[in-house]
Amino acid sequence: MAQRSKAYKAAKAAIGEDLYSPVEAIRLAKETNPSKTDATVEVALRLSVDPRKADQMVRGSVSLPHGTGKTARVVVFATGDRAEAARAAGADVVGDDDLIARISEGWVDFDAAVASPELMGKVGRLGKVLGPRNLMPNPKTGTVTPDVAKAVTDIKGGKIDFRVDKHSNLHFIIGKTSFEAKALVENYAAALEEILRLKPSSSKGRYISKATVATTFGPGVPMDPNVTSVDSSEL
């Protein structure tokens, strides 16, 4: 097990074992960030769903009101006018068979992929590469669309995708430690609202059983999973 830094241990001690409201937890995660870098702030939720069942898969996307703090690298599978529109919207790489071949050889240096619908038959072959990395274009997240330019603009503007993993955990970022705490809280509130909206009707009991927020190199701050209404005015 890796040795923890003194800064990490100090942050862990400051957090203690308490269960915090989301607003308090996010503020504390930001304030106790042990790194001098502008770290990413990430939330982890444990959901009471069984992702092996098709009707309990939680997957979606949301545009964070204050963005993510990073410029996402976006690739687009498109041809003709749609390819030109994607380039004009700021896509980092646009292609068809050439892009598919490049990715099939292991290149995955991007954060999101968008596809024009008519190309999904070919893009689907990349499932073994893109699927495990949650990069496969999907209509449910708006990344399989004829309007590839809008998809690129949305992603560059702070749209994030999320998907529950096989252990029923769901991870998503809410910004950087350089953000004001209010902005981080409002980003979390937007994501939480969408995740709650997507609760499967077949999911019984408490939907969110565990919640934690942490910076890249910081300890997790436990949040009360029963608090589903978040108000930044509490800051």
From Swiss-Prot:
InterPro entries: Ribosom_uL1_bac-type, Ribosomal_uL1, Ribosomal_uL1-like, Ribosomal_uL1/biogenesis, Ribosomal_uL1_3-a/b-sand, Ribosomal_uL1_CS. GO terms for molecular function: rRNA binding; structural constituent of ribosome; tRNA binding. It holds the Pfam family Ribosomal_L1. It comes from the Bacteria. PROSITE patterns: RIBOSOMAL_L1. GO terms for biological process: regulation of translation; translation. Keywords: Repressor, Ribonucleoprotein, Ribosomal protein, RNA-binding, rRNA-binding, Translation regulation, tRNA-binding. GO terms for cellular component: large ribosomal subunit. The keyword Endoplasmic reticulum does not apply. Part of the 50S ribosomal subunit. Binds directly to 23S rRNA. The L1 stalk is quite mobile in the ribosome, and is involved in E site tRNA release. Belongs to the universal ribosomal protein uL1 family. PANTHER family: 54S RIBOSOMAL PROTEIN L1, MITOCHONDRIAL (PTHR36427), LARGE RIBOSOMAL SUBUNIT PROTEIN UL1M (PTHR36427:SF3). This is Large ribosomal subunit protein uL1. It comes from Micrococcus luteus (strain ATCC 4698 / DSM 20030 / JCM 1464 / CCM 169 / CCUG 5858 / IAM 1056 / NBRC 3333 / NCIMB 9278 / NCTC 2665 / VKM Ac-2230).
